[in-house]
């Protein structure tokens, strides 16, 4: 995929970006993705099942994620679950989205819209 292909997918929707972030550390099933998004956003984003799976299907169609062949041990697994993984192209797009957002945040700091440090530790 070319830089042009990556750029054509930006900006990502917040849900699509969160799904990609949830898969950076490894494969997850849909419910696991949902819970990771809720945890990481400290409950600020609680995706419903329908929109989550529609977004996942769109990301699969775009080649950003794929259904994973890896599964947990049978005693820990439910065969009905679909596991997803981030593709190399999906990682490229996620990185490009982070760079795009970092630039915008930098502009906000330059314009003194915000001052000081921004914490992601969970304290508001």
What kind of region is each of these model predictions?
Residues 1-3:
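Long, low-complexity, charged/polar intrinsically disordered regions in eukaryotic proteins
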Residues 62-77, 85:
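Beta-hairpin "wing" of winged helix-turn-helix
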């Amino acid at each position: 995929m070319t830089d042009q292909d990556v750029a054509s997918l930006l900006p990502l929707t917040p849900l699509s970006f969160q799904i990609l972030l949830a898969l950076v550390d490894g494969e997850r099933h849909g419910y696991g993705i949902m819970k990771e998004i809720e945890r990481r956003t400290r409950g600020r984003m609680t995706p419903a099942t329908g929109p989550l799976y529609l977004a996942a299907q769109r990301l699969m169609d775009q080649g950003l994620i794929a259904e994973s062949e890896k599964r947990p041990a049978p005693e820990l697994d439910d065969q009905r679950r679909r596991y997803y993984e981030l593709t190399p192209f999906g990682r490229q797009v996620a990185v490009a989205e982070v760079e795009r957002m970092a630039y915008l945040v930098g502009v906000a700091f330059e314009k003194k819209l915000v001052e000081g440090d921004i914490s992601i530790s969970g304290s508001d």
